Amino acid sequence: MKIENNILKHYLRNVYFITGTAYAGKSTTVKMLAERYDMVFCGENYHIGVSDAVAMPEIQPDLCYRRELTDWKDFVRRSPEEYERWIYNSGREGAGFEIAELISLARDRKVIADTSIPLDILKEISDYHHVAVMLSPMSMSVDRFFDRSDPDKQFLLNVIDSCDDRDAVMENYRRGLARINSKKHYDEYAESGFFTVVRKDDGRDTRDEVCDTIARHFGLIS
């Protein structure tokens, strides 16, 4: 059975999506929008509790990777090419879980989601005024990846720090981040046709400005 895109779009009409590269301010903006406009908050990996429990290796092998992992050092030691492939394919495998979760939340309230749903699927299930792309220069998305206090990033940093060849592992992991946030992927976001906000590396605190810009794009304020 397949649910047609026009049906999904109807049931997702209260959902607003933010996607983009690392360190672009997605998590902060999603949180601010949820608080300011009484929206349901769906932060990064909001669907992971269900997908970890339900994903099947023969259907969603990349979503099952972490569940079957016995040593997180293997996670951070993967080749940059494999890490890039895994990240983007996990987003594609997880799209169905995200969509189902969002439909369950969005019947009576607006929802704001930090999403990994691929751009081509977003174009099918949503529209211009319900999607915003946030981008950062690669120097920020890679070099400052661990300059955040969120538990997932700090957990990975601790895993890397625990490796005997810590510096080599960190360099390998950063090469993976560079591939994930490469010019190729940056351009895919920038040229997607969706509304786009680019973070400037000038030291200014632009959180309120960016939040207002995206809220206006979403029609939450005039």
Where are these regions (language model features)?
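Pre-Walker A adenine-sensing motif
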Residues: 1-10
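NTP-dependent small-molecule kinase module
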Residues: 3, 177-222
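Hydrophobic anchor at the beta1->P-loop junction of P-loop NTPases
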Residues: 18
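P-loop (Walker A) phosphate-binding loop of NTP-binding proteins
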Residues: 21
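Conserved glycine(s) of the Walker
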Residues: 25
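Short beta-strand-centered segment that lines the nucleotide-binding/catalytic pocket of NTP-utilizing
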Residues: 37-56
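ATP-dependent small-molecule kinase phosphotransfer cores
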Residues: 50-110, 117
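Conserved phosphate-donor/acceptor-positioning beta-strand/loop module used by diverse small-molecule
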Residues: 126-164
